[in-house]
Swiss-Prot record:
Protein name: Fe-S cluster assembly protein DRE2
Annotated keywords: 2Fe-2S, 4Fe-4S, Cytoplasm, Iron, Iron-sulfur, Metal-binding, Mitochondrion
Cellular compartments per GO CC: mitochondrial intermembrane space
Keyword match Cytoplasm: yes
Cofactor: [2Fe-2S] cluster; [4Fe-4S] cluster
Assigned protein family: Belongs to the anamorsin family.
Motif Cx2C motif 1 mapped to chain: 318-321
GO biological process, one term: iron-sulfur cluster assembly
Written domain comment of the UniProt record: The C-terminal domain binds 2 Fe-S clusters but is otherwise mostly in an intrinsically disordered conformation. The N-terminal domain has structural similarity with S-adenosyl-L-methionine-dependent methyltransferases, but does not bind S-adenosyl-L-methionine. It is required for correct assembly of the 2 Fe-S clusters.
Gene: DRE2
Annotated segments matching region Fe-S binding site B: 318-332
This protein's record includes keyword Iron: yes
Length: 355
């Protein structure tokens, strides 16, 4: 008889996964270790011995800073930053950037704590760690950094008073309250007296408005004289505010408007210091001086020089120099001069051509 063989199809390498649920009785802890402590197995083992490994996670701080690992959101009740191998936190401080603080804050539960192993985290208010922790959303309380619990705030509902609609009465916009009446939807409509149930003595009299004007429309009294001056307004003459002594006082020119050496400063658009008037007066004086100098330069008859434009028997290349600008070429030296006869004497008197 041949021997029987039994084959086991079950996998021998199936890992056993255990889901640890975070409750108030087993708070989860995250240990952030600097790179230097990884080479000191004894120190790392001593730290892990003081924590329950079922609810404690260990992450390297340099890998978190480089973005190689991600932290679950709102998971940990305590995040503990371990010291370096030499007992200081010089290496860990260099890795705690603003991005790392943001990741740690997201991983903390509401009301969770962020501490250091040596207890020096967040003790210096002027330190960079304290400022970055505050900027990431943590608050300092009792010497530790906490993530505030905003769920504790309770929204208070605002209730508004409502009118009591329990009464079966309808209020008309044009009269008193009337009782409700049922109107059939099919067949002929019955005339319903809306005031049958209301006694006449209880019905107040409503005066009809005098003006049947639509709402929101105003009226203007055109009898008012809008152009007339209001007697209640007291007008002040500006000239009476200054005395003769005030007018004699020199204007106080600001230092920035004072004349300087070099390029002349231009006055402001709405100048009030007197610089605009001063510059205008200087320009007027310069123009008057130039005009007086031009008027003084006059030539007498003896000082006039005779200008002979042509020579008898000599003509230009085009032969039209004496005919006028309409017949002269572009390079003619007589452009702008009136037509003349060849050999005619031309005199200049006060910039005017005298033929």
């Amino acid at each position: 008889m041949a021997p029987s063989v039994t084959i086991d199809n079950s996998s021998d390498f199936s890992p056993i996964t255990t889901n640890f649920k975070t409750t108030s009785f087993n708070p989860r802890t995250l240990l952030l270790a600097p790179p230097s402590i990884a080479s000191h197995e004894e120190k790392l083992r001593n730290v892990l011995a003081t924590h329950d490994r079922t609810v404690t996670d260990l992450q390297m701080l340099d890998r978190l800073s480089a973005g190689l690992v991600t932290l679950p959101e709102s998971t940990y009740d305590l995040v503990l930053i371990l010291t370096d191998a030499d007992g200081t936190r010089v290496e860990s401080k260099g890795l705690l950037t603003r991005d790392v603080f943001g990741k740690i804050t997201q991983a903390l539960k509401a009301g969770a704590k962020l501490q250091a192993q040596d207890g020096t985290f967040g003790q210096e208010i002027d330190g960079a760690e304290y400022q970055e922790a505050i900027l990431s959303g943590l608050v300092a309380e009792g010497g530790v950094m906490l993530k505030p619990d905003y769920s504790a705030s309770v929204a208070v509902p605002l209730r508004l008073r409502r009118k009591d609609n329990s009464k079966n009465a309808a209020v008309s916009s044009a009269g008193p309250a009337v009782s409700m009446a049922a109107v059939p939807l099919h067949g002929k409509r019955k005339s319903v007296d809306m005031t049958d149930d209301v006694p006449e003595k209880d019905v107040p009299k409503v005066d009809s408005p005098k003006n049947d004007a639509p709402k929101g429309v105003g009226f203007i009294d055109f009898s008012d004289d809008f152009d007339a001056e209001d007697d209640d307004d007291e007008l002040i003459d500006e000239d009476t505010l200054l005395t003769e002594e005030d007018m004699k006082k020199p204007l106080a020119i600001p230092p920035e408007c004072a004349p300087r050496a070099g390029k002349r400063r231009r006055a402001c658009k709405d100048c009030t210091c007197g610089l605009a008037e001063k510059l205008a007066k200087e320009d007027a004086d310069k123009r008057a001086t130039a005009d007086s100098q031009l008027q003084a330069l006059k030539l007498d008859a003896d000082d006039l020089a005779e200008v002979d434009f042509t020579v008898q028997g000599k003509v230009g290349s085009c032969g039209n120099c004496s005919l006028g600008d309409a017949f002269r070429c572009d390079g003619c030296p007589y452009i702008g001069m009136p037509a003349f006869k060849p050999g005619e004497e031309v005199r200049l008197l006060n910039n005017d051509v005298q033929l």
